[in-house]
């Protein structure tokens, strides 16, 4: 447990995570100062009166006078104000670092470009099925500091690359990097390897590293070692096995579950299940209750979620596909009886869209591209693409064309912030329009 007495603490960024940091310090007799670049950040009205605040920008004077800065993952460490503070010797951490210094129970730490939330939630469900007092959160649900509880027996945290950059005390009982594909390139000017390096920090001091046998970028820098357990489609300690038209989850050659018993569907979800099982096994959760959790888990909203099935047409909401890798995961191994009507678009965050091209072949696919980077996406295969300003226009365009056996899939490969509040709002609008048009 760290001692923060008499420390001059500055918290950057409000919202739920910022407020959890304020509460953390107040409970330890330290009154922090708070700043936020937004003029009216969420949570401002919930800030106790004694806490000094500075909004609408950063206060360099406060930062340089601080002993400790707790930075929101939303602000880049490369920001000139943070760089100056770091150069002056000020310690900069995030809420996950504060959490790791306090947590008394084992931690399962999950990162990756795609699938993090599903795997985090699944491991949490496996722990609950075993009767374990588990805290689940971090980058999803509740901020980590709100999970701290002396009675907890296990923590399961989803961690972003930004959170890992400011974390050095994590000693995970089991850690995984599920996959590494281009995302947030606007925050990583040195490209994919810089982003990967942030993700791989999760393995430092971990007891067990769960790696993806199909993605070399998920391996620790020095290569796989005796701490590593692997999962993959055809390879790995945990893998898929197809026999007589049926698919099984297998562990080291032993069949453990037929996927038809699972409510999740799609190859990417089967590998998510393998990763979750590997993590659960690594921290000693009973295999039987973990498998039971796999048969009852229905998946998370906006992640390849069936919004409507009507007149033989399936409308799928995969709004959480905010990067290219996530859309690749949705398209890889996808079976559609008729034509796939694929909705792509939004803010591509400077990503390279070309890896999608190999999934856009044949004559049973149509593209509807919208938003800031719609033109770039339409250029992947212009002869089957139509470009509109908004997703709603695209959906009204495609609705009269769908036939029984077709699928309408929103898997945009882009962030939503150019036209929506967040990916959830985009998914909700898609679902509402699907019910109206379908």
Curated annotation (Swiss-Prot):
Q: Name one GO molecular function term.
A: UDP-N-acetylmuramoylalanine-D-glutamate ligase activity
GO cellular component terms attached to this protein's record? cytoplasm
Q: Chief subcellular site?
A: cytoplasm
Q: Which InterPro entries match?
A: Mur-like_cat_sf, Mur_ligase_C, Mur_ligase_C_dom_sf, Mur_ligase_cen, MurD
Task: List UniProt keywords, sorted A-Z.
Answer: ATP-binding, Cell cycle, Cell division, Cell shape, Cell wall biogenesis/degradation, Cytoplasm, Ligase, Nucleotide-binding, Peptidoglycan synthesis
- The EC number on file is 6.3.2.9
Q: Which Gene Ontology BP terms does the record give?
A: cell division; cell wall organization; peptidoglycan biosynthetic process; regulation of cell shape
Q: Which reaction does it catalyse?
A: UDP-N-acetyl-alpha-D-muramoyl-L-alanine + D-glutamate + ATP = UDP-N-acetyl-alpha-D-muramoyl-L-alanyl-D-glutamate + ADP + phosphate + H(+)
* Chain residues that bind ATP: 112-118
Superkingdom per UniProt: Bacteria
- Where found in the cell? Cytoplasm
- Pathway(s) this gene product operates in, as recorded in its UniProt entry: Cell wall biogenesis; peptidoglycan biosynthesis
Q: Tell me the protein family, please.
A: Belongs to the MurCDEF family.
The UniProt function text for this chain reads: Cell wall formation. Catalyzes the addition of glutamate to the nucleotide precursor UDP-N-acetylmuramoyl-L-alanine (UMA).
| Annotated protein name in UniProt | UDP-N-acetylmuramoylalanine--D-glutamate ligase
What is the species listed in this Swiss-Prot or TrEMBL entry?
Answer: Salmonella paratyphi A (strain ATCC 9150 / SARB42)
């Amino acid at each position: 447990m760290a001692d923060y007495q008499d420390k001059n603490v500055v918290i950057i960024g409000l919202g739920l995570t910022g407020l959890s940091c304020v509460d953390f310090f107040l409970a330890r007799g330290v009154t922090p100062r708070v700043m936020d670049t937004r003029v009216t950040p969420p949570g401002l009205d919930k800030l106790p009166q004694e806490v000094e605040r500075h909004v609408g920008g950063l206060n360099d004077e406060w930062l340089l006078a601080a002993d400790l800065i707790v930075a929101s993952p939303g602000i880049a460490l490369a920001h000139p104000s943070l760089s100056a503070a770091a150069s002056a010797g000020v310690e900069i951490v995030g809420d996950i670092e504060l959490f790791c210094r306090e947590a008394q129970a084992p931690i399962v730490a999950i990162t990756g470009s795609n699938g993090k939330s599903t795997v985090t939630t699944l491991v949490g469900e496996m722990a609950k099925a075993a009767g374990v007092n588990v805290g689940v959160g971090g980058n999803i649900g509740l901020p980590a500091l709100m999970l701290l509880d002396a009675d907890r027996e296990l923590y399961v945290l989803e961690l972003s690359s930004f959170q890992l950059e400011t974390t050095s005390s994590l000693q995970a009982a089991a850690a995984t990097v599920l996959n590494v594909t281009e995302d947030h390139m606007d925050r990583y000017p040195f490209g994919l390897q810089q982003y990967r390096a942030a993700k791989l920090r999760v393995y430092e001091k971990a007891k067990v590293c769960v790696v993806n046998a199909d993605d070399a970028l998920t391996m620790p820098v020095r290569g796989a070692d005796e701490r590593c357990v692997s999962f993959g489609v055809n390879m790995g300690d945990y893998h898929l096995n197809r026999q007589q038209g049926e698919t099984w989850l297998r562990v080291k050659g032993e069949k453990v579950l037929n996927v038809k018993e699972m409510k999740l569907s799609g190859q990417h979800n089967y590998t998510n299940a393998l990763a979750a099982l590997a993590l659960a096994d690594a921290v000693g959760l009973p295999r039987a209750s973990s498998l039971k959790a796999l048969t009852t888990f229905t998946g998370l909203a906006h992640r390849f979620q069936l919004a409507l099935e009507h007149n033989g047409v399936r409308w799928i909401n995969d709004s959480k596909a905010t990067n290219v890798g996530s859309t690749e995961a949705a398209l890889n191994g996808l079976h559609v009886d008729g034509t796939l009507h694929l909705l792509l678009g939004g803010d591509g965050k400077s990503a390279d869209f070309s890896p999608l091209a190999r999934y856009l072949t044949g004559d049973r696919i149509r593209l509807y591209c919208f938003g800031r980077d719609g033109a770039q996406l339409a250029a992947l295969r212009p002869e089957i693409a139509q470009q509109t300003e908004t997703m709603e226009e695209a959906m009204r365009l495609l609705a009269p064309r769908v036939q029984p056996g077709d699928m309408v899939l929103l898997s945009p490969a882009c962030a939503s912030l150019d036209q929506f509040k967040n990916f959830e709002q985009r998914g909700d609008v898609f679902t509402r329009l699907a019910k109206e048009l379908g």
